[in-house]
Amino acid sequence: MQTSPLLTQLMEALRCLPGVGPKSAQRMAFTLLQRDRSGGMRLAQALTRAMAEIGHCADCRTFTEQEVCNICANPRRQENGQICVVESPADIYAIEQTGQFSGRYFVLMGHLSPLDGIGPDDIGLDRLEQRLVSEKISELILATNPTVEGEATANYIAELCAQYGVEASRIAHGVPVGGELEMVDGTTLSHSLAGRHKIIL
């Protein structure tokens, strides 16, 4: 079937989004063209500006259009000396939504993966080490994902902290709130048992 080259180009471009296959891309393209051209224009403008203007924070490496992001620039976020290490900027948004953390962050943009040729410098651990040397850090909270690579990355950073006398802690993993034990996998349940705490009345 012969279709508009621009329409084909739009559908192919939409497929760069995660979870969007040919059918989803086709549906999105037709929806924008048929029902929401103004929405499509706003999307195009927002994408163009974001791609051109959003870079990385000079301190924590999260996404920002400024040299230093709002969190790193906030003096109150520096008071407790805590830095939470995460794998991606999306993790910062997740933690910020809890309202439970008032320190700063460091974004790895990935995790250690020797099989894929990703070493310490590739995820910015050289820059993190510089911060351990130059800043007054009371605690590094390791919030990497609970995967094999995430655990290996957390262990590597913990060893780095030990060299500089900085306390390192790992976020707890375990049974989700509202979950049922019979539905939880063995590895998660093992983490829950190992990370149990006393009930204080």
Swiss-Prot record:
A zinc finger (C4-type) spans 57-72. May play a role in DNA repair. It seems to be involved in an RecBC-independent recombinational process of DNA repair. It may act with RecF and RecO. Pfam families: RecR_C, RecR_HhH, RecR_ZnF, Toprim_4. The keyword Transmembrane does not apply. GO terms for biological process: DNA recombination; DNA repair. Residues 81-176 form the Toprim domain. It comes from the Bacteria. Keywords: DNA damage, DNA recombination, DNA repair, Metal-binding, Zinc, Zinc-finger. The keyword DNA damage applies. HAMAP family: RecR (MF_00017). Belongs to the RecR family. The gene is recR. One of its GO terms (molecular function) is zinc ion binding. This is Recombination protein RecR. The lineage of its organism: Bacteria, Pseudomonadati, Pseudomonadota, Gammaproteobacteria, Enterobacterales. It comes from Salmonella arizonae (strain ATCC BAA-731 / CDC346-86 / RSK2980). InterPro entries: DNA_Rcmb_RecR (IPR000093), Rcmb_RecR (IPR023627), Rcmb_RecR_Znf (IPR015967), TOPRIM_dom (IPR006171), TOPRIM_RecR (IPR034137). SMART domains: TOPRIM. SUPFAM superfamilies: Recombination protein RecR.
